[in-house]
Amino acid sequence: MSEELQPNQTPVQEDPKFGFNNYAEKLNGRAAMVGFLLILVIEYFTNQGVLAWLGLR
């Protein structure tokens, strides 16, 4: 009678759907790599840098 009841399962916690989670960080990193590659390709073919695109040079 003095025994404490213990759960027989460990609750499964889901990853948060917002904020800094593993999926969001991977997606952000991949998008950054693709964007950086596109900037390099555009600079190579146009012979102009980012500052020239923005009108700062």
Curated annotation (Swiss-Prot):
Locations listed in the record: Cellular thylakoid membrane
Coiled coil: none
Protein's membrane topology: Single-pass membrane protein
Keywords, ordered alphabetically: Membrane, Photosynthesis, Photosystem II, Pigment, Stress response, Thylakoid, Transmembrane, Transmembrane helix
UniProt note: phenotype after gene disruption: No visible growth effect of the single mutant; double hliC-hliD deletions are out-competed by wild-type in high light (500 umol photons/m(2)/s). Quadruple hliA-hliB-hliC-hliD deletions die rapidly in high light but grow normally in normal light (40 umol photons/m(2)/s). Quadruple mutants are sensitive to norflurazon. In an hliD-PSI-less mutant phycobilin, protochlorophyllide and protoheme levels are reduced. A single gene deletion red-shifts the chlorophyll/carotenoid ratio.
Molecular function per GO: chlorophyll binding; pigment binding
Pfam families tied to this protein: Chloroa_b-bind (PF00504)
Any single GO BP term: energy quenching
GO cellular component terms, A-Z: photosystem II; plasma membrane-derived thylakoid membrane
Domain of life of the native organism: Bacteria
InterPro entries in alphabetical order: Chloroa_b-bind
Transmembrane spans: 25-46
Similarity section: Belongs to the Hlip family.
Function: Involved in photosystem II (PSII) assembly and/or repair under high light stress. Required for binding of chlorophyll and carotenoids by the Ycf39-Hlip complex. The Ycf39-Hlip complex binds D1 at an early stage of PSII assembly along with Ycf48, ribosomes and ChlG, the last enzyme in chlorophyll biosynthesis; it may be involved in chlorophyll reuse and delivery to D1 in the initial stages of PSII assembly. Binds chlorophyll a and beta-carotenoid in a 3:1 stoichiometry in the presence and absence of Yfc39; in the Ycf39-HliC-HliD complex, HliD binds all the pigment.
Protein name, entry field: High light-inducible protein HliD
